[in-house]
């Protein structure tokens, strides 16, 4: 029995109007021509405003600072107009040198990477240049831009620790010029100081409105420094075709834009070289002397604080460090062999409580002031046979009368496990369940 396919369902006129064939054939040639006429100018504008390399022969500074010529590029109209093959005599005398060349060479040997973020990230190393051969009486404008090195996209191969070509580059983004905020400079200023582009920020936000330089991630870029001789009619930098300028390129400043560092050696070198990356340095980078001082400082502050320790003990660290450490040790290690009266006397330095009026008898010398003074209420507490007995106002009032209480001798138990719990928990453990606390005002 032969199979006969069922006939295709027929669409209604309304449904047929929204079919794929009807939608594809609905556009007229006139509409397509009008659409192309509006898109082509935009594409041409993007291509012209984001040229990968300057056209023609521009001045390139090699490692020795000599003037050379670069081969012509395929771009027809770059953002920065072409410098003449032979610059004017005045501009030809100007030379530019990279101040941080040694640091750039270290990064260049590993493959420099620059972080780009949505909000913008500053460059490190920073491009710092100095000029010579300028006219001291003239005014100059210094600016910088960053252009793609090639039309390729890269990826980092971790097993080879190298950058490999991953494909064709993404569509170029609009190029931007960064004019140094201190421009225009006088020639005298350029001869005495260097120009630092430390405020340049790199971003991957195509809608950025803060003047940051927009880059694509995983693409290689080349920074360029331009110097323009300012004339009287130079009002803006929108059109540089009529200006006299010079471009300088340093090959060691080529970098790859990334959203996260790929090479761990680059990360380590940036942490070691960047003074603003101190937060990423761990304690293992300390020297032996610094490590010993830190360890001794930690040991001095690692003792357990007694919840019933008298006031004024912190001042002992400045006066007699050895005596204070000994007092603290006696409070925690030999308390079982001391009575409460002798223990309080050894820790406070007083046999009994001294009223504030009687402090004049101590004198005003520095030695007497360095002696720890117990807290009035804390030093006057009566030594009951049990620390858990209620401290009523009447008992406190009776203890405050007279020149000072007399402490009966009795054996003091160990409180090591209470002190390890912290001051508040230790007091709660020492206090009897029926204790009534009276607030001191």
UniProtKB/Swiss-Prot annotation:
One of its GO terms (cellular component) is nucleus. One of its GO terms (molecular function) is DNA-binding transcription factor activity, RNA polymerase II-specific. Residues 103-282 bind DNA. It is found in: Nucleus. The keyword Methyltransferase does not apply. The keyword DNA-binding applies. Transmembrane segments: none annotated. InterPro entries: p53-like_TF_DNA-bd_sf, T-box_DNA-bd, T-box_sf, TF_T-box, TF_T-box_CS. It comes from the Eukaryota. Expressed throughout all cardiac tissue during later stages of development. Also expressed in the cement gland, jugular vein, lung bud, cloacal aperture, rhombomeres 2, 4, 6 and 8 and in a subset of motor neurons. PROSITE patterns: TBOX_1, TBOX_2, TBOX_3. One of its GO terms (biological process) is regulation of transcription by RNA polymerase II. Keywords: Developmental protein, DNA-binding, Nucleus, Transcription, Transcription regulation. Its main location: nucleus. Transcriptional regulator that may be involved in heart developmental processes. This is T-box transcription factor TBX20. The lineage of its organism: Eukaryota, Metazoa, Chordata, Craniata, Vertebrata. The gene is tbx20.
